[in-house]
Structures are given as C-alpha cells and as structure tokens.
Design a protein with these regions (language model features):
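Active-site-adjacent core segments of small-molecule enzymes
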Residues: 1-288
C-alpha cells in the first residue's frame, strides 16, 4: 500500500437529468478514504512495472446497500485500477488466475495462457506517483436503467518523473511529498451505455470505445501527512467490496458476481491473520 489518504467526494451541481442517479442524484459532499496500492500480490519494488489500484470508500451515504449482512452500513465503495480492461474475460479465467497467484506461481499460469499473459503485459506500467495515472472500474455497473463504467482521472495532470535511483517504496514517498505541499484532485467520470450486448458486460477484456466519459463528481485529496504507523495499519485493515453500494449502482457481469464472495473471503482472511476487527468507518474520526 502506498498510502490511505483523506479525501472529499463532491457530487457536481447542475448535472444533466440522465446523470442524476443514486449517489449522484443531488449535489453533496462525502468524507472519504482513498487507498493507493500496487496490484501485485507479492511485495516488490515500486519501480517495477505493475497495475496500480485506487480504492475509494465514501462515508455517510444513506440508503440500503447490496452487500449481504451490511445492508445498513453507511459506506459506498469504488474499486479502480490503472487500466481500462481486465486480464480475465470470464469467471473461469479469473478463478484460474486467482488460484495461481495464491499458489505463488502466476508465471506458470501465464505460460499456459498466453492471451492472458499478453493482456497482463499491455496493462502494467511504471509511474512516478500514485497521482499520475487514471484509474478505471474495468467491470460494468448499473446506472438506473443503463450500464456504466467509472473512471478516476487527474483534474490537472502533473509531471512525476521516476527517480534515477528509486527507493523500494518511492511511490509512498512521492505521494507524501506531494500532499505535504497542497491538495490534489481527481475528476470522477461515468461512461454510459443503453442496452449493450451481453458480451460487452460479461467480457471485461472488451473496451467501450465509442461512448464519452462524463464528469459527475470531484475527489479532492486534502493536504495532509498520512505516513504514520497508525494510518498504515488503518489503511491495511480497510475492507473494499464493489457490492458495498446502492442498488442503483449494482455491479454487473460474472467477474463482479465472483468478486462479491472472493473479496469478502480475502478480507476475512486478512483480518483474522492480523487479529484485527473488521469495521466500516462512519467518518474520518472513526477509527474503529
């Protein structure tokens, strides 16, 4: 994890009627946590090419949520990565990749599945800061009577060169230095489709190229010092699940259906291993 930072999720005023759905129905500001990480299951230097993850947890969101047993929680999660499409096109490929990673032998899986290996190689990259790339939902979500994908895009991109001799966790250091000097913002956008063919929902390796992304909110990361032992533990113990959401934004497709239980099991395993209770924060001041 590069850092878990304090942010505000600010729904835009004056949205077009077709965008005023669920979470975006009214202009409003939510306290949020934004956790940046590498996607690799193995601990590796930040200078190595990888997918980067951005997990966003909004707090104080009213309304019933879809995740079993957490219907009354007041959080809403978004999970995004630094590539627009996923490595696996269906649950079978997703399960095979997951088992290979859990067994510590993804290389053998890639050798047996060259198409997935090619997708992996085209999706990873090197970045000078977690604030540099755009992040995507990859999978599709309901948007009332339409289907949406999400994007988190820097409002004003900044140059972030990779150091000539980067430290093991230089992305954390870069994020710390940047947020010590001031705030930073991302635009939160949706890409909408009406009645897409099932394959464009089920196959997460397919990009939607024709529909524009439209801004619905802004994510304002506050100026702060997040690099403390307590915040590191807090961030590592946060749980994210795409099904912790309002019904208007229901996750769609086989990959999302699989993530519902896979992510819950991974969260339970991590919290048991760390002897940490799993709680959903209600505000910035709520540390569980």
């Amino acid at each position: 994890m590069h850092g878990c930072v304090k942010a505000r999720f600010i729904v835009e005023e004056g949205l077009d009627d077709d965008l005023r759905v669920g979470l975006f129905a009214e202009p409003r500001s939510y306290e949020a946590w934004l956790r940046f990480s590498n996607a690799s299951a193995e601990l590796q230097p930040d200078a190595k090419a990888d997918l980067r993850g951005a997990a966003l947890k909004l707090m104080g969101v009213p309304g019933a949520k879809l995740l079993d047993g957490e219907e009354h929680c007041t959080t809403h999660d978004f999970l995004l990565v630094s590539h627009s499409t996923f490595l696996a096109k269906d649950v079978k490929e997703f399960a095979g990749l997951g088992m290979a990673i859990a067994a510590g032998n993804p290389a053998a899986f890639f050798l047996q599945n060259p198409r997935i290996a090619l997708r992996y190689l085209t999706s990873i990259g090197k970045h000078g800061s977690p604030l540099q790339p755009s992040y995507f939902s990859m999978a599709a979500y309901l948007f009332r009577d339409r289907v949406a994908k999400y994007q988190l895009r820097p409002t004003a991109p900044e140059a972030a060169p990779i150091p000539s001799a980067p430290s093991f966790d230089f992305l954390r250091e870069s994020l710390k230095a940047r947020l010590a000097s001031g705030s930073f913002s991302f635009d939160f956008l949706v890409q909408l489709r009406e009645s897409p063919p099932p394959r464009d929902v089920e196959d997460t390796t397919r990009a939607w190229s024709d529909e524009p992304f439209r801004k619905v909110a802004r994510v304002e990361i506050l100026q702060q010092d997040f690099d403390t032992p307590d915040q590191q533990v807090f961030g590592e113990n946060l749980s994210f699940n795409p099904w912790r959401c309002l019904p208007e934004h229901r996750p769609l497709g086989g990959i999302n259906r699989a993530r519902r239980q896979v992510y819950r099991a991974l969260s339970a395993f991590r919290h048991d291993r760390n002897a940490a209770p799993r709680v959903e924060p209600k505000s910035w001041s709520d540390r569980g």
